[in-house]
Amino acid sequence: MTAQSAQPLYIGGRPVDATSGETFTVTNPYDGSLLATIGQASQADVDSAVQAAQRGQREWAAMTGMERSRILLRAVALLRERNDELAELETRNTGKPISETASVDIVTGADALEYYAGLAPAIEGSQIPLRDTRLVYTRREPLGVIGAIGAWNYPIQIACWKAAPALAAGNAIVFKPSEVTPLTALKLAEIFTEAGLPDGVFNVVQGDGRVGAMLTEHEGIAKVSFTGEVGTGKKVMAAAGGSTLKDVTMELGGKSPLIVFADADLDRAADAAMMANFYSSGQICTNGTRVFVERSAKEAFEAKLVERVARIKAGDPMDPSVNFGPLVSFEHQEKVLSYIALGKEQGARVLAGGDAWNSGEWAKGAWAAPTVFTDCTDEMRVVKEEIFGPVMSVLAFDDEEEVIRRANNTKYGLAAGVFSESLNRAHRVIHQLEAGICWINTWGESPSEMPVGGYKESGIGRENGVETLNHYTQTKSVQIEMGPFESVF
């Protein structure tokens, strides 16, 4: 793939050159090649995008739910039609294997749009009778313009997840993708326009954290939806509340426990632990990186992990047979490799991997070997801190009460999972785990019907599921009096 020319922003239904005079580059993490030069948005560009969104939102909100649904479904059809083209672009930008992006990233983004397209005509209020001559009815009205800030690990999926409920409810969006993986956002904007979305209803402003700050502080933004790390999320929330008391939805980090009891199907649990740590090279917020294994099953479970790690096929992400790609950037590679070194320093035993993969044929890419640490303790930094890479920590436990206490001993609360053939125990344990997304005898799938979000410092609000529509509407109450009006004057 040859380097693309400087890419514009997308404002008011068309490409628009950034006015800041600044640009940034986007590279392929597999070989370091240049993919694109992108224009950095200025404050004037953000203002223009918000104004375009305000104009477009009025037209969009005036449509019926059925009319909005038809347009969203046309966008779904275009996404599915262009799945392979978009998957290739996503793979070259993120480094994720084409086997993943072609089967998950665009598919699940389109699924979310299709799901909320079906719900758009069903958004309704309620009627509350007070007496024969008096009643109250409610309307669920859109918030207005949503500022959406995406993460770099699932660029187009996250854009769709944020757009779907917001658009279904009649809002407009100004979307800022991560500056690390910004390429598919512009394609999505073009698809929305082609599908018939009114000009200005979906805008894209490119750039670094400065652009995100412009959105969170903008008086024309009614709500901010952010996906990213906890530290940035706190800054976003402070800015959103400090400017105009904006509503916020946040999907933040995690250090999720995956608990394997001795009675579990160990092959199934080992398969899940592999997916929960090495899919997308470990760059998934819900990953089960703290793998607690009942002591009597630990040795057998570890043997199954070693066998499975040996079967991983790393290589060119465009090769359909490859199932493990590089990390998203060379900067992120440095972070992950530093944690692998730290794990060794703090006494964790390397069960598999532990290599830098930065020499020979691997030197040109942002690689880190899939790594399994064992004999870990809860105090180790590789156990406590989010690494966001292919690093699994295995910890032994002796009883149910102990593992629940240790699993909950974290500032995070995004996800959790239990593997046991006793469904009574599995449900009992899950109900005591402090996490918003939980799985029993499986891991990782987040269908559009399932609310996604975290407890504690892992987030606020939810994405996906019916209840998320409530986060993109506001309730107006109307009281009607059909009898005489009584005044004390």
Curated annotation (Swiss-Prot):
Q: How is the cofactor bound?
A: Binds 2 potassium ions per subunit.
Cofactors: K(+)
Membrane-traversing stretches? none
Q: In which pathway does it act?
A: Amine and polyamine biosynthesis; betaine biosynthesis via choline pathway; betaine from betaine aldehyde: step 1/1
Instruction: Supply the SUPFAM superfamilies for this chain.
Output: ALDH-like
Q: Which domain of life is it from?
A: Bacteria
Disulfide bond entries: none
| Seems to be a necessary countercharge to the potassium cations, annotated site positions | 247
User: Which residues are the active-site ones?
Assistant: 162, 251, 285, 463
Pfam family example for this protein?
Aldedh
An example of a GO molecular function for this protein is: metal ion binding
The record's family statement is: Belongs to the aldehyde dehydrogenase family.
Assembly information from the UniProt record: Dimer of dimers.
- Role: Involved in the biosynthesis of the osmoprotectant glycine betaine. Catalyzes the irreversible oxidation of betaine aldehyde to the corresponding acid.
What is this protein's name? Answer: Betaine aldehyde dehydrogenase
Record organism: Chromohalobacter salexigens (strain ATCC BAA-138 / DSM 3043 / CIP 106854 / NCIMB 13768 / 1H11)
What is the taxonomic lineage of the source species?
Bacteria, Pseudomonadati, Pseudomonadota, Gammaproteobacteria, Oceanospirillales
